């Protein structure tokens, strides 16, 4: 987004891969502030990407994978959804490499879970709070690679990576 202030973030995974992001606080201030605060509080450290769908998105930020108990929920407070169908002008398109907040059917239910698009997903535009994008092509390649991993089911969850994709940390670079 040209001429827009950015905040850089760096997701480091336990396997050594990295996704570099640029966040847009002027376009989605509540969402960026929430994400940055959770990162600074180390909320995401040790959480996994629990839902990956090839040619769609990879989603994480809400669960720890426990070998004995499976997916263990980690809760954070909900925030206002910053997207058009919720009365907020958010011009960020859900293109390959864009990061956006996951939510339930309730428009103001986003909290900590986010997803990174691994393909253009225009049907999400105006319905989910996009708030940044991958800063470089290598970061997009990492996201796409994770989107292609083998997945399975656990209880009522589907599209769970068979080999956990674990966030080591997310650093904010201001």
Predicted regions and their residues:
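Cyclophilin-like peptidyl-prolyl cis-trans isomerases
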Residues: 1-174
């Amino acid at each position: 987004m040209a001429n827009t202030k950015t905040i850089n973030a760096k997701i480091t995974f336990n396997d050594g891969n990295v996704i570099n992001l640029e966040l847009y606080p002027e376009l989605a201030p509540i969402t960026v502030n929430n994400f940055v605060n959770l990162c600074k509080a180390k909320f995401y450290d040790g959480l996994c990407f629990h839902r990956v769908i090839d040619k769609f998105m990879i989603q994480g930020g809400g669960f720890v994978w426990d070998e004995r108990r499976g997916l263990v929920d980690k809760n954070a407070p909900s925030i206002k959804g910053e997207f058009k169908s919720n009365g907020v002008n958010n011009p960020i398109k859900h293109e390959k490499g864009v990061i956006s907040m996951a939510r339930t059917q309730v428009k103001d239910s986003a909290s900590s879970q986010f997803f990174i698009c691994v393909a253009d997903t225009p049907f999400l535009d105006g319905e989910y709070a996009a708030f940044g994008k991958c800063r470089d092509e290598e970061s997009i390649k990492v996201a796409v690679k994770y989107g292609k991993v083998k997945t399975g089911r656990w209880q009522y969850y589907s599209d769970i990576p068979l080999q956990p994709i674990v966030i080591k940390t997310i650093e904010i670079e201001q």
